[in-house]
């Protein structure tokens, strides 16, 4: 169970950082 909790916390942290950077300034990198 602890592995699940740590994995969830890791994903949540990465998600928060990603959204913070994403909303800080609009994406300028082309998808292709």
From Swiss-Prot:
Membrane topology: Single-pass membrane protein
Iron listed as a keyword: no
GO-annotated biological processes: photosynthesis
Functional note: Found at the monomer-monomer interface of the photosystem II (PS II) dimer, plays a role in assembly and dimerization of PSII. PSII is a light-driven water plastoquinone oxidoreductase, using light energy to abstract electrons from H(2)O, generating a proton gradient subsequently used for ATP formation.
Complexes and interactors: PSII is composed of 1 copy each of membrane proteins PsbA, PsbB, PsbC, PsbD, PsbE, PsbF, PsbH, PsbI, PsbJ, PsbK, PsbL, PsbM, PsbT, PsbY, PsbZ, Psb30/Ycf12, at least 3 peripheral proteins of the oxygen-evolving complex and a large number of cofactors. It forms dimeric complexes.
Family to which the UniProt record says this protein belongs: Belongs to the PsbT family.
HAMAP family noted in UniProt: PSII_PsbT (MF_00808)
Protein name: Photosystem II reaction center protein T
Organism: Psilotum nudum (Whisk fern)
Lineage of producing organism: Eukaryota, Viridiplantae, Streptophyta, Embryophyta, Tracheophyta
């Amino acid at each position: 169970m602890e592995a699940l909790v740590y994995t969830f916390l890791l994903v949540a942290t990465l998600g928060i950082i990603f959204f913070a950077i994403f909303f800080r300034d609009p994406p300028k990198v082309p998808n292709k």
